[in-house]
């Protein structure tokens, strides 16, 4: 840039059009660089190191729990460091998201598993999580990095079609649709979400669709709209234990309301798989986690995920404890013992987690095969 300014000063007598052309050329180059940076890994991607082996995990002697009144943040343990997301499919999906002006919770929530999910990973099931209704939420949960506002921009009426068009071209097996909360809308955006599901299924009836939706302030008409939209998995996250809910979640979110939403979704459509998620490391006790798992089973929830809470910025809740992989294994065993169809429990597990979606895909495919066999037998 300084070289360009010196050149302009030296040739000040040159025609204005030459200077304009030079500025234009440099502006184009700058725009090209910006575009390449936008499509490539960000700074956060580079500070994450490759996965450490189990032996390195076991040798780690760093502090894992922050004591009451202690302000210093805990150092990130080795089992929470992930690889840089790369691959053709990762780049393809990221580029098309920009082109169609779609948002993903994978990026907005800074999920550490983005490379694995978008690229296919070891299971070969490629997944992505689209965030509908914009990138601005009407709620302000203290763990979440998504932008907030009382009145976000209006809904994009083209979003259902754009989303379905993009998904059809990606060749995904499983898609998760999540959304911001839109308390400013009479129906909370439930019809918008349902329309998106129908558009996706119209283009590819074989793709499995999971909707990770808000509580709609307990409005059961909204829950019914989503439950009967043609989706395969109805997900709504309880997030944390009952005692911590008022402190961790927005004041409009309630523990018992979440359980009711999950219960009623299954009542409206008994064929649905229902799913919820719990974050660990916020100061909860083992007894409180156990109670939450039992409450979810009593609500008829089929699948549960447990993952480590990660502080997204300095303005959000600090991590109280980094839970060890061994402890997560314990909760996986407890979930299975309580009767969940599937329990995904691990430091990097998130509500929209690839390995869980691979397992749920298997369940749904087996159900479809049994249904087809029954229909053939009737004929």
UniProtKB/Swiss-Prot annotation:
EC number: 2.8.1.8
Pfam families: LIAS_N, Radical_SAM
Note on cofactor: Binds 2 [4Fe-4S] clusters per subunit. One cluster is coordinated with 3 cysteines and an exchangeable S-adenosyl-L-methionine.
Keyword list, A-Z: 4Fe-4S, Iron, Iron-sulfur, Metal-binding, Mitochondrion, S-adenosyl-L-methionine, Transferase
Chain sites annotated for binding [4Fe-4S] cluster 1: 106, 111, 117, 352
Main location: mitochondrion
Reactions catalysed, as given in the entry: [[Fe-S] cluster scaffold protein carrying a second [4Fe-4S](2+) cluster] + N(6)-octanoyl-L-lysyl-[protein] + 2 oxidized [2Fe-2S]-[ferredoxin] + 2 S-adenosyl-L-methionine + 4 H(+) = [[Fe-S] cluster scaffold protein] + N(6)-[(R)-dihydrolipoyl]-L-lysyl-[protein] + 4 Fe(3+) + 2 hydrogen sulfide + 2 5'-deoxyadenosine + 2 L-methionine + 2 reduced [2Fe-2S]-[ferredoxin]
Cofactor names: [4Fe-4S] cluster
Pathway of action: Protein modification; protein lipoylation via endogenous pathway; protein N(6)-(lipoyl)lysine from octanoyl-[acyl-carrier-protein]: step 2/2
Membership in a protein family: Belongs to the radical SAM superfamily. Lipoyl synthase family.
Other facts: This protein may be expected to contain an N-terminal transit peptide but none has been predicted.
Name listed for the protein in its UniProt record: Lipoyl synthase, mitochondrial
Organism: Drosophila erecta (Fruit fly)
Origin organism lineage: Eukaryota, Metazoa, Ecdysozoa, Arthropoda, Hexapoda
């Amino acid at each position: 840039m300084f070289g360009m300014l010196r050149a302009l000063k030296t040739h000040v007598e040159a025609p204005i059009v030459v200077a304009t052309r030079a500025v234009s050329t440099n502006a184009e180059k700058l725009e090209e660089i910006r575009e390449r940076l936008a499509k490539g890994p960000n700074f956060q991607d580079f500070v994450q190191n490759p996965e450490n082996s189990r032996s390195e995990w076991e040798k780690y002697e760093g502090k894992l729990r922050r004591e009451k009144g202690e302000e210093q943040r805990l150092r990130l343990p080795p089992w929470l460091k992930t690889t840089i997301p790369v691959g053709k499919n990762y780049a393809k999906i990221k580029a098309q998201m920009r082109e169609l002006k779609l948002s993903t919770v994978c990026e907005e929530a800074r999920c550490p598993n983005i490379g694995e999910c978008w690229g296919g990973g070891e299971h070969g099931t490629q997944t992505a999580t689209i965030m509908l209704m914009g990138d601005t939420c009407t709620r302000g949960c203290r763990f979440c990095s998504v932008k907030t506002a009382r009145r976000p921009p209006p809904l994009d009426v083209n979003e259902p079609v754009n989303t379905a068009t993009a998904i059809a071209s990606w060749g995904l097996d499983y898609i998760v649709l999540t959304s911001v909360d839109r308390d400013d809308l009479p129906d909370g955006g439930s019809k918008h979400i349902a329309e998106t599901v129908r558009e996706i299924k119209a283009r590819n009836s074989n793709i499995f669709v999971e909707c990770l939706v808000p509580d709609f302030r307990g409005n059961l008409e909204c829950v019914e709209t989503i439950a009967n939209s043609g989706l395969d998995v109805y997900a709504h996250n309880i997030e944390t234990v009952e005692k911590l809910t008022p402190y961790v979640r927005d004041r409009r979110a309630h523990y018992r309301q979440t359980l009711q939403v999950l219960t009623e979704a299954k009542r409206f459509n008994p064929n649905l798989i229902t799913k919820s998620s719990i974050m660990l490391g916020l100061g909860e006790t083992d007894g409180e986690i156990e109670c939450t798992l039992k409450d979810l089973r009593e609500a008829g929830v089929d699948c549960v995920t447990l993952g480590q809470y990660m502080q997204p910025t300095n303005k959000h809740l600090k991590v109280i404890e980094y839970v060890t992989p061994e402890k997560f294994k314990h909760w996986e065993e407890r979930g299975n013992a309580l009767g969940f169809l599937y329990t995904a429990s691990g430091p990097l597990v998130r509500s929209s987690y690839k390995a869980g979606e691979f397992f749920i895909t298997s369940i749904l495919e087996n159900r479809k095969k049994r249904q087809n066999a029954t229909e053939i037998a009737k004929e």
